Amino acid sequence: MAAPGRPSPLAERLRGAWQHRGALALALWPLSLLYGVLTALRRALYRTGLLRSERLPVPVIVVGNVIAGGAGKTPVTLAVVRHLQARGWRPGVISRGYGRATADCREVLPASSAAEVGDEPLLIARASGAPVFVARRRAQAGRALLAAHPATNILVCDDGLQHLALARDLEVCVFNDEGAGNGWLLPAGPLREPWPRAVDLVLHAGSPPGGGAPQFALSRELAAHAVNASGQHLPLEQLQGEPLHALAAIARPHDFFAMLHARGLQPESEEALPDHYDFSSWKRPPDKRLRLICTEKDAVKLWPAHPDALAVPLALRIPPAFFDTLDARLASLSSSGH
């Protein structure tokens, strides 16, 4: 089991290898060559029309990444949806619904469970109020959403840069602070596909990853408050010195713990769990003094059994120029008659 608040030793070693072209990465490089051939072949099949991409009747924005692991794309999706709403658009969100126990196409409602629809789509639905549908085939989710909510005039796809079966009008690629790593494809590097590649906008938490698309720096920090299951806010400063058990089932749990520390909180214990962890069998620490504090994504799964858990929202700082560029691209789509 991983040390509290840290990834497993194997995950740490692989992640370290992805940042450098060392011995482990070199040993895995032949597999990356094979992966690259398969990736290129798949793209060629779509480019030549042997495999078809389905185009939906409204503009589609895909927010995703080209690296394995967490890049923070879902918070960006939520920020894009809120921006579109503020600009008068009526957005809907489609997603695969990774980690859910179901396999059908279905709507994500505020009362849905994460087991039915996935933790990230449920978080988006509750936080934005936008209609959300999940399906393995994103185009199917889009068709179902537009049929159920015909006023929707734009779709945002949470993840799916590599899901070429869905035609898209704009692509937003998100990078965490590790960027493109050593620049190699899986498994010798973190890349799901070669980078740079053509996208419309890039958001990066670290150094600019290169490529020809407009690039914008983003920063992440925790909000200054926690939220309980009833939606009540509690200033984090009131939790300083209190006995806390912090837990995170995200791709990079140590980032959450570090951000808690930056807000002045020092949990007595920290528990790192796999991304999209199913909390149905999770055992609460026996120490009754400890208050649970977690991410928003984990809270949608924890609250049914542990309504006293506190969730700390993530606050993104995205430059206004990013949204200005997004608006300009959407305006050009409208003028071209999409």
From Swiss-Prot:
Keywords: ATP-binding, Kinase, Lipid A biosynthesis, Lipid biosynthesis, Lipid metabolism, Nucleotide-binding, Transferase. Its EC number is 2.7.1.130. GO terms for molecular function: ATP binding; tetraacyldisaccharide 4'-kinase activity. Transmembrane segments: none annotated. It is an enzyme of class 2 (transferase). GO terms for cellular component: plasma membrane. GO terms for biological process: lipid A biosynthetic process; lipopolysaccharide core region biosynthetic process. ATP binds at residues 67-74. It catalyses: a lipid A disaccharide + ATP = a lipid IVA + ADP + H(+). This is Tetraacyldisaccharide 4'-kinase. It comes from Acidovorax sp. (strain JS42). The gene is lpxK.
